[in-house]
C-alpha cells in the first residue's frame, strides 16, 4: 500500500473541502471580511492559508528529505496549533451555522488522516540526504499545485481584509438626539454591521429583526434585542425609528423566476410585515428609513452625459421594478402618519461588501475595465452612507420622500479601474470582456456592464457634506 500516494489523495480532498468552506461559508453566507469581530479569525486564516499553499505546492510532486523533513514536521505542527486556535476564536466571536461546523469537523478528521499517513514515511525521510526528491503523480500533482495557488490567493485576500478592518471611518458617525428605540432589519448584512454599532455608540436601544435571532444577538455581543418576526413585538413596544435594510443579496445566482421571487419576498414581503406592525402600533414611529437602490432608475445608454436625480423616472426592467415594488410597500407607512425616507443606495464602498472582490484582480496585477468601461458608476463610501442616514434621522418628518445615497462623482467604470490601479500601484491592462459576464449572469449582467449617473441632489441641497466625494478619496481611505 502506497501510504504517501494515499496521503496526497486525501490532501486533494482537503483542497476541495477547504474551497467549499471558504467560498460558501467565509465569503457568501458568513461574509467574514465584512465583520469587525472577525479580524483575528481572518488573520489566522491568512497565516494558515499561506502554510497550506506551501504544503500543497511543496508536496504535489516532491518528497521532503533530511532537514527538510523536519521543516515539514514543524509546518504541520504550526498548522495544527493554528487550527485549534481558530476553533477557539470562532466560538468566541460568532455562532457557526451547522453546515460550517460539520465541514470543519470533516476537515479536521481528513487533515489528521493525511498528516498521519505522511508521518509513516517520516523515519525514512529524515534519514535520507537533505533535499527534495522529485516524485510526480500526474494530474494529482497538477491539481494539488493548483490548490496551493488558490489557497495562497485566499490567504492574501484574508490578510488584506484583516489589516483593513480595524480602521473603520464609519465609527465616527453619530446619530444625535436623546436615546431612542430603533428597529433595524437586515442588521447582519454589510451595512448593518456598521450601522448597529454606530446606533449603540450613540446611546440608542436597538431591536434587530433577523431570521436567526440568536446568531444576530451573538454578532453584536448581546447589546441588541433580536426577534425572529414582527409578531414578537407588542403594539405597545414604542419604536421611534425603523431602518429597513432587509433584502437577499441581489448579485449572485442568475435571475430565474424563482430567484426573482426570492428577491421580491425578502424586500417587499418583509417590508409588508413591518408596515402591518406599524398599523397596529399604539405609538407610531417618528420616521421610517427604507433602503432601496439606484437600480430604481434603470440603466443609461453608454456615453450619455445625462445626470439623474430623485425626480427621474424608473424603467420597465426587473432591477427597477424590484425597487419600485419595495418602495411602494414601504410608502404605505405614510397612511399611518409615519414619514418614509426612501434611501436609494449606490454601490457601497467599504472594507466589506463588493469592493474587496472588485479590487482583488488589481491587487494581483490583473485588473482592468469591465466591458466597454464607459458605463457610469454611482457609488458611496460606507461612512458617507451612514452620515447620510444620520442626516435624514435629524430631519425627521422633513425627510419624507426619495433620497439618492450616492457620491457627487459618478465615474465611468474605466475611470474607476484607473483609480483603483493607481491607489494600489498596479497596472490596469487586463480588461474583462462583456460576453462571458453576460453568459454567466444573464439579465443580471446589467448590474456590472451597464450603469447610470445618479446625483445626490437632495442631500446636497439640504446641506449634507461628503467626507469622500471622489473615488480616489474613497479608495485612498479603504485600500
Show the residue positions of the predicted features.
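Mid/C-terminal beta-alpha module of Rossmann-like enzyme folds, strongest
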Residues: 171-181, 395-443, 476
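N-terminal Rossmann NAD(P)H-binding glycine-rich loop of SDR-like oxidoreductase domains
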Residues: 180-202
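NAD(P)H-binding glycine-rich loop region in Rossmannoid oxidoreductase-like domains
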Residues: 214-273
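Conserved beta-loop-beta element that borders a ligand/cofactor-binding pocket
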Residues: 292, 328-351
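Glycine-rich "substrate-gating" loop/helix at the edge of Rossmann-like oxidoreductase active sites
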Residues: 314-319, 344-352, 372-383
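Alpha-helical substrate-binding/gating segment
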Residues: 331, 359-367, 375-411
Amino acid at each position: 500500500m502506497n501510504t504517501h500516494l494515499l496521503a496526497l489523495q486525501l490532501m486533494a480532498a482537503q483542497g476541495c473541502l477547504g474551497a467549499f468552506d471558504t467560498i460558501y461559508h467565509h465569503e457568501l453566507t458568513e461574509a467574514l471580511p465584512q465583520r469587525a469581530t472577525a479580524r483575528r479569525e481572518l488573520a489566522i486564516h491568512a497565516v494558515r492559508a499561506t502554510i497550506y499553499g506551501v504544503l500543497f505546492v511543496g508536496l504535489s510532486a516532491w518528497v521532503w528529505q533530511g532537514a527538510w523533513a523536519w521543516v515539514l514536521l514543524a509546518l504541520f505542527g504550526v498548522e495544527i496549533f493554528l487550527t485549534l486556535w481558530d476553533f477557539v476564536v470562532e466560538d468566541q466571536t460568532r455562532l457557526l451555522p451547522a453546515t460550517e461546523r460539520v465541514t470543519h469537523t470533516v476537515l479536521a478528521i481528513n487533515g489528521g488522516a493525511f498528516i498521519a499517513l505522511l508521518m509513516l514515511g517520516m523515519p525514512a525521510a529524515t534519514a535520507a540526504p537533505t533535499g527534495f526528491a522529485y516524485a510526480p503523480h500526474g494530474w494529482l500533482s497538477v491539481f494539488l499545485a493548483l490548490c496551493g495557488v488558490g489557497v495562497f490567493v485566499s490567504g492574501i485576500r484574508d490578510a488584506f481584509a484583516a489589516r483593513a478592518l480595524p480602521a473603520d471611518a464609519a465609527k465616527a458617525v453619530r446619530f444625535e438626539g436623546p436615546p431612542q428605540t430603533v428597529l433595524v432589519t437586515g442588521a447582519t448584512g454589510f451595512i448593518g454591521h456598521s450601522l448597529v454599532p454606530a446606533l449603540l455608540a450613540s446611546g440608542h436601544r436597538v431591536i434587530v429583526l433577523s431570521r436567526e435571532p440568536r446568531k444576530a444577538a451573538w454578532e453584536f455581543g448581546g447589546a441588541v434585542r433580536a426577534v425572529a418576526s414582527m409578531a414578537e413585538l407588542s403594539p405597545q413596544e414604542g419604536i421611534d425609528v425603523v431602518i429597513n435594510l432587509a433584502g437577499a443579496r441581489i448579485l449572485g445566482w442568475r435571475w430565474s423566476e424563482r430567484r426573482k421571487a426570492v428577491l421580491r419576498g425578502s424586500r417587499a414581503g418583509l417590508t409588508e410585515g413591518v408596515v402591518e406592525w406599524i398599523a397596529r402600533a399604539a405609538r407610531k414611529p417618528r420616521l421610517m428609513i427604507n433602503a432601496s437602490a439606484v437600480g430604481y432608475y434603470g440603466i443609461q445608454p453608454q456615453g450619455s452625459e445625462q445626470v439623474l436625480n430623485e425626480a427621474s423616472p424608473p424603467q420597465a426592467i426587473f432591477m427597477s421594478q424590484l425597487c419600485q415594488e419595495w418602495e411602494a410597500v414601504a410608502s404605505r407607512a405614510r397612511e399611518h402618519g409615519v414619514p418614509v425616507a426612501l434611501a436609494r443606495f449606490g454601490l457601497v464602498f467599504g472594507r466589506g461588501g463588493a469592493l474587496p472582490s472588485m479590487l482583488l484582480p488589481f491587487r494581483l496585477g490583473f485588473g482592468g475595465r469591465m466591458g466597454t468601461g464607459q458605463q457610469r458608476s454611482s457609488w458611496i463610501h460606507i461612512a458617507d452612507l451612514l452620515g447620510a442616514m444620520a442626516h435624514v434621522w435629524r430631519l425627521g418628518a422633513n425627510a419624507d420622500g426619495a433620497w439618492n445615497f450616492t457620491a457627487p462623482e459618478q465615474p465611468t467604470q474605466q475611470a474607476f479601474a484607473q483609480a483603483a490601479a493607481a491607489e494600489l500601484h498596479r497596472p490596469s491592462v487586463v480588461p474583462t470582456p462583456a460576453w462571458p459576464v453576460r453568459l454567466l449572469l444573464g439579465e443580471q449582467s446589467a448590474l456590472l456592464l451597464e450603469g447610470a449617473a445618479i446625483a445626490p441632489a437632495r442631500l446636497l441641497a439640504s446641506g449634507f457634506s461628503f467626507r469622500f466625494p471622489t473615488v480616489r478619496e474613497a479608495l485612498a481611505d479603504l485600500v
